[in-house]
């Protein structure tokens, strides 16, 4: 019996070597594009709608510039500093990633070429810088931002990416679990953004007191792109179209929905009104919290993580922030400390608690090395579970230290050449002073509702001063002052 001929389109060829999985390559390119769309146009229009009208162009342009600048630097030197051969214990050797021979080789993970991996990792690096921008909107000198982006990418992002994600990184070898960037992207951007906001200084007092979004519907459109784009963000990190990719996507959306609802319920309980801005904040904290765990935890754990991510960052933002002199001093425009640093740290710790050994073996290919404390106790491997929690905590401390130090040094270096902050006169004007352009051909800042009682419209950090009371199961009163 003669053999059935193999379809010609599936035969190996110069453009399709035997090691290449066309399905995995196609999904990886699509996942990268989804992540890219989270930034362009997702965060561009989210920032453009969330800020005061006079800052819409500047906020959007900071994001667009960062995306382009990161891409340029990434292919010239930054990718191989993050994932290449070891230069120092925490760093890879800088080198071009543009040569055909290098681009067509199989990537260090996955059945696709280096070119695909470079693209995928680039959009992750780009969104990290754009998230940092959220902390300094409304006053950072654009020329300082133009310098900040390549410097921070080179001397901070590559450092943490190599240590945590590279196969040669010391935390990767120890066994840290950061499935899709809770540490490398979100904790880094939250800490770096808060640190940069400290050095740049605050917005004008009147802008800090009243900073209403100029277009809530536009902000919601950006938030929707951000949420749906997370399908590629977490679904692309198994580097294949397998079972763990499906689980990661489902867990991502389950956690996010739970977090959003939790945040909205807390707003209703304590502020008596559901807030659109609050819902977006809850959405973001849910997305961030599940990121380090998406493909390595069970669905029920994702729901629990959503409850935590919708409540703990809410409490730190609405209560602790207002009572802390340090937190009040630093003007973090988009609250990235809470939505990214705290939510990312929370996700990392909960990953150390709920990481399921079988799911980790699907992702890492190693069984019983990555064991959450919850399962470690069940399996009589409590010491392994405690070790995992310890590694997760060590990763948090490492990322905080690296980003505080590197971001501070970069800001101090930049201000030797250009001011970090715009002048008071230019901040009064906004986009017209910074770029000679305006977003809308209308007068005023859209501040018609001066008596608005939204807890988010006047300032992102309002104290919970009007106590809301609810009865607990025993009939006593629970108050939040």
From Swiss-Prot:
The annotated topology with respect to the bilayer is: Multi-pass membrane protein
Among InterPro entries, the record links this protein to: Ammonium/urea_transptr, Ammonium_transpt, Ammonium_transpt_CS, NH4_transpt_AmtB-like_dom, RhesusRHD
Q: Name one GO biological process term.
A: ammonium transmembrane transport
- Which key words are in the record? Ammonia transport, Cell membrane, Glycoprotein, Membrane, Transmembrane, Transmembrane helix, Transport
Q: Which residues are glycosylated?
A: 114
- Which loops or segments lie on the Extracellular side of the membrane, by the record? 1-28, 80-116, 163-180, 237-250, 297-299, 355-393
> Where are the bilayer-spanning segments?
29-49, 59-79, 117-137, 142-162, 181-201, 216-236, 251-271, 276-296, 300-320, 334-354, 394-414
Q: What up-regulates or down-regulates this gene? A: Accumulates in roots, in a RAM1-dependent manner, during colonization by arbuscular mycorrhizal (AM) fungi (e.g. Glomus versiforme).
UniProt main location, coarse: membrane
Which cellular compartments is it found in? Cell membrane
- Source domain of life is Eukaryota
Alphabetical GO CC annotations of the entry are: plasma membrane
- Which Pfam family, an example, fits this chain? Ammonium_transp
Q: Which residues lie on this side of the membrane: Cytoplasmic?
A: 50-58, 138-141, 202-215, 272-275, 321-333, 415-481
Please provide, alphabetically and separated by semicolons, the GO molecular function terms listed in this UniProt record. ammonium channel activity
PANTHER family (alphabetical): AMMONIUM TRANSPORTER 2 MEMBER 5, AMMONIUM TRANSPORTER MEP2
What is this protein's function per UniProt? Answer: Involved in ammonium transport. May be involved in arbuscular mycorrhizal (AM) symbiosis with AM fungi.
- Family per similarity comment: Belongs to the ammonia transporter channel (TC 1.A.11.2) family.
- Protein name, as recorded: Ammonium transporter 2 member 5
High-level lineage:
Eukaryota, Viridiplantae, Streptophyta, Embryophyta, Tracheophyta
């Amino acid at each position: 019996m003669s053999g059935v001929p193999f379809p010609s389109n599936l035969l190996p060829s110069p453009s399709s070597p035997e090691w290449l999985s066309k399905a995995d390559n196609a999904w990886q390119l699509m996942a990268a594009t989804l992540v890219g769309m989270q930034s362009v146009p997702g965060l561009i229009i989210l920032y453009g709608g969330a800020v005061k009208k006079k800052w819409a162009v500047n906020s959007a342009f900071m994001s667009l510039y960062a995306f382009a600048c990161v891409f340029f630097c990434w292919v010239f030197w930054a990718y191989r500093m993050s994932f290449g051969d070891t230069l120092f214990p925490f760093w890879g050797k800088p080198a071009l990633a543009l040569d055909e021979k290098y681009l067509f080789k199989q990537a260090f993970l996955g059945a696709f070429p280096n070119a695909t991996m470079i693209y995928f990792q680039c959009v992750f690096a780009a969104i990290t810088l754009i998230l940092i921008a959220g902390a300094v909107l409304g006053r950072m000198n654009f020329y300082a931002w133009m310098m900040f982006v390549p410097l921070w990418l080179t001397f901070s992002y590559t450092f943490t990416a190599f240590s945590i994600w590279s196969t040669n990184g010391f935390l990767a070898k120890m066994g840290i679990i950061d499935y899709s960037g809770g540490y490398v992207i979100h904790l880094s951007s939250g800490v770096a953004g808060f640190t940069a906001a400290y050095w740049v200084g605050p917005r004008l007092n009147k802008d800090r007191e009243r900073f209403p979004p100029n277009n809530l519907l536009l902000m919601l459109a950006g938030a929707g792109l951000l949420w749906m784009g997370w399908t590629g963000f977490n679904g692309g990190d198994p580097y294949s179209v397998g079972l763990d990719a499906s689980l990661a996507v489902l867990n991502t959306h389950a956690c996010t929905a739970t977090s959003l609802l939790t945040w909205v319920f807390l707003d209703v309980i304590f502020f008596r009104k559901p807030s659109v801005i609050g819902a977006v904040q809850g959405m973001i904290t849910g997305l961030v919290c599940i990121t380090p765990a998406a493909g390595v935890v069970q669905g029920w754990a994702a729901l629990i993580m959503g409850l935590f991510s919708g409540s703990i960052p809410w409490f730190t933002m609405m209560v602790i922030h207002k009572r802390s002199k340090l937190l009040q001093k630093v003007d973090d425009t988009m609250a990235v400390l809470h939505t990214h640093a705290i939510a990312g740290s929370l996700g990392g710790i909960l990953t150390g608690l709920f990481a399921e050994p079988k799911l980790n073996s699907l992702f890492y290919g190693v069984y019983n090395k990555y064991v959450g404390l919850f399962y470690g106790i069940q399996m009589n491997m409590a010491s392994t579970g405690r070790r995992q929690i310890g590694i997760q905590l060590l990763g948090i401390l490492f990322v905080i230290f690296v980003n505080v130090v590197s971001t501070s040094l970069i800001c101090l270096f930049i201000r030797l050449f250009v001011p970090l902050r715009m002048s008071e006169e230019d901040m009064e004007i906004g986009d017209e002073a910074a770029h000679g352009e305006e977003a809308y051909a209308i007068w005023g800042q859209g501040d018609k509702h001066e008596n608005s009682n939204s807890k988010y419209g006047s300032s992102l950090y309002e104290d919970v001063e009007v106590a809301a009371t609810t009865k607990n199961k025993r009939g006593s009163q629970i108050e939040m002052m």
